[in-house]
Amino acid sequence: MSSGYSSAPSVSHTSSDTDLNRIDSYDDGAEETTDEQRMCGLSELVTSCLTSSRLKAIDEEDEEENCNDIEIVGLSKTTTKVKRSKKVLSCPIVSSSTKKENGNAAPFLKSSQFTDVPPTIRFYTKGTKVTKPARKIQARLTWCHNSLLPIVMRQTLAASHFTVVDESLFYVGYWGRHLKSAQYRALQPHQKVNHFPGAFHIGRKDRLWMHIRKQQERFEGEFDIMPFTYILPTDRQELLKYLETDASRHVIVKPPASARGTGISVTRKPKDFPTTATLVAQHYIERPLTINRAKFDLRLYAYVPTFEPLRVYIYDQGLVRFASVPYSHSVSTISNKYMHLTNYSINKLAEADGVANKPVPKWTLHHLWEHFDEMGVDREKIQREIEEVIIKAFISTEKPIREHMSRFLEQEFICYELFGIDIILDEDYKPWLLEVNISPSLHSGTPLDVSVKAPLAKDVLNLAGVYVPPSFDKLSDADYSTRPRNGRKNREQLIKEASWVAAYKDQLGVIDNRIFKRLTPEDTRALVEFEDELERIGDFKLVFPTAHTSHYQKYFAETIYMNILLQQWQIAQEDDRSIGINRLEQLCRQKHMQSDQETSF
């Protein structure tokens, strides 16, 4: 074979969602295996025999209103345990739905593009009729109950036949509070959780600023993405000196780990800067952009499936949050929280407090872009600059997060995270990062919220790539070798990584397609995961890495092999993705991901 990357042979695919739909009509006892194999070459993970175990359900009304269509199992004073049967049955992936039902129902599974890579579960918004999987698979479609699990997420899970269960029971997924670091060690390969250990490095306002400040010192003038911030009480004297030089200066004081407007104030009074409590004080942007004379900020949503290699997606939709009363530069108004703060949790009370004669407005992000178009504003430039701010924020914090993960997480693929990014525009349309939230609220109190957050919940779960879990008796020895990124690196991989990182440094950040001459099993897993992920992207947009983001590599605290591999892959794939995809498919057909041997091309 030729050693050139561009000469990879073309391989046709027989796997498709149509194949999956066709399997949906098989009976529980069907012996047909050809279509299952053709579907996507399912691994032992989902083709293994299934036990006849069932979760014992109890009738319990959900603690949140409007969720009575979602069953919660095991929430009684006496914990309900999973009963296991010694009898093993042979059954297919999906249930014996009738052909008529399948014709009207959306598919339950999303096939991989690649042989021997299992499919992922499809998620939908409320009201979508979805093909039911086999009963014994549906028994394992369980999600951990948590008080932070929002209604739109519950409804999305219910549409795909998931049951919400007590945390003491077997569960596949978790969406809730950030876990304690040590809890990540107990997670199993079949589980998915919505946080990374160490995410506080970007979610805490003090940590985020510390990391951005380091980047400002390394790259002067290139990381002015966040208003200057003081960490109190350490920086108290520096803050007082800043305020003394100009009587019009103010700062926004916030607790470092709060959300939804808790504990926020705009001030310049020394008494508001305690000498003991930990707070952050951020330069106040005195000339913000206003719409209809009101100050506003943006809530955007960023999704990160992995920090090695770092990948960042931004959701196409978002929220625009307004202050309740017209903005004024007057110092005398500085204490008016309804004028200077844009948190919806604060401003929704303005009408009841008598300071506004109507409910505070809220726009979608699309509404804002339409407004800019009508005003003749270059909104594409603003969007590019916002993307740059978000990318730089994640690059600033990725090293400490990776280091924290390495201590507490054996398999990175079990984690994913949705971040709430708060951005404000000044009067020159420059975007400024205010903070990053690691648990952005998906609770939806208005139809506008539902229109944004319900599709978001669905797209997040699809992008996360939730697999059908193995049977209860197979959990300890399930074969995850065909899953992307199994967390292990052999000597061959380590040697290749070290040599290419050294070459990258020697060539001053230049890399070429020779990095693809030999793809190791670990390389293949990472690229297969990425290509399948792009097939589930929904309304997210990949902003890093792309074919045009190689200039960001210099900002990383250290050169990571997987980052440069994926960056170069994006450059090589720009004109024709099918070439690389066909090569990966050939490797999958050769069971390369299960091999410890390197394949030469």
UniProtKB/Swiss-Prot annotation:
One of its GO terms (biological process) is response to hermaphrodite contact. It comes from Caenorhabditis elegans. GO terms for cellular component: ciliary basal body. The record marks 260 as: Essential for specifying initiation versus elongation step of the polyglutamylase activity. Expressed in many sensory neurons in amphid. Transmembrane segments: none annotated. Residues 1-18 have a biased composition (Polar residues). Mg(2+) 1 binds at residues 422, 435. Keywords: ATP-binding, Ligase, Magnesium, Metal-binding, Nucleotide-binding. This is Tubulin polyglutamylase ttll-4.
